[in-house]
């Protein structure tokens, strides 16, 4: 698998939300169902308010040797007192299966923790369509703090965990 992934020349450009991409991020929150941890829906105005209130909002453009997939990842992280809360993390299904979902989230967490020094919390809220993300956070270094009878899981990120991002991925923050 490593040889195959290395042969793809995968480049992930992680971009802070701006006027040029915020409508695409809003669109993704409204349409992405399968790989969506909390299935929160936001308008462009909602996202602008979140930015004004100090949230960190990113999107990612993924390209490989076959072409440019465009903006296919959205991530919203809120600052809540002494923690960062992963409000939303979602991906277009067309880029799944190349570990891009893992390396992008870990890169964003590492970036934000280096800037803020804050602990990261997250949540999984089950929906009719997002079962594929049920255990995703556990696979990328989060520990379950609690789970309620409806299947809502609350997590903390294990920041002591060594984050391995294979060197055949190129990650750029823009």
Task: Please place each PLM-identified region on the residue numbering.
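A glycine-rich phosphate-binding loop feature that marks nucleotide/adenosyl-phosphate handling sites
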Residues: 46-47, 127, 154-156
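Acyl-donor binding region in acyl/amide transferases
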Residues: 65, 71-148
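Conserved N-terminal entry element of GNAT/NAT acetyltransferase domains
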Residues: 1-18
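Short acidic (Asp/Glu) and glycine-rich catalytic loops that position anionic groups and cofactors
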Residues: 4-8, 28-31, 85, 114-118
């Amino acid at each position: 698998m490593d040889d195959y992934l290395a042969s793809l020349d995968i480049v992930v450009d992680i971009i802070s939300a701006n006027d040029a991409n915020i409508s695409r991020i809003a669109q993704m929150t409204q349409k992405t169902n399968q790989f969506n941890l909390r299935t929160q829906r936001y308008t462009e105005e909602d996202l602008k308010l979140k930015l004004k209130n100090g949230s960190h909002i990113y999107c990612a453009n993924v390209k490989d040797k076959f072409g440019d997939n465009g903006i296919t990842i959205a991530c919203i992280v809120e600052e809540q007192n002494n923690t960062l809360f992963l409000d939303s993390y979602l991906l277009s299904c067309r880029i799944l299966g190349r570990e891009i979902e893992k390396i992008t989230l870990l890169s964003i967490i590492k970036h934000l923790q280096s800037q803020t020094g804050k602990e990261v919390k997250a949540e999984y809220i089950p929906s009719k369509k997002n079962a594929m993300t049920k255990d995703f956070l556990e696979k990328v270094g989060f520990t379950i703090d609690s789970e309620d009878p409806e299947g809502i899981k609350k997590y903390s990120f294990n920041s002591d965990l060594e984050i391995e991002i294979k060197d055949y991925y190129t990650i750029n923050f823009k």
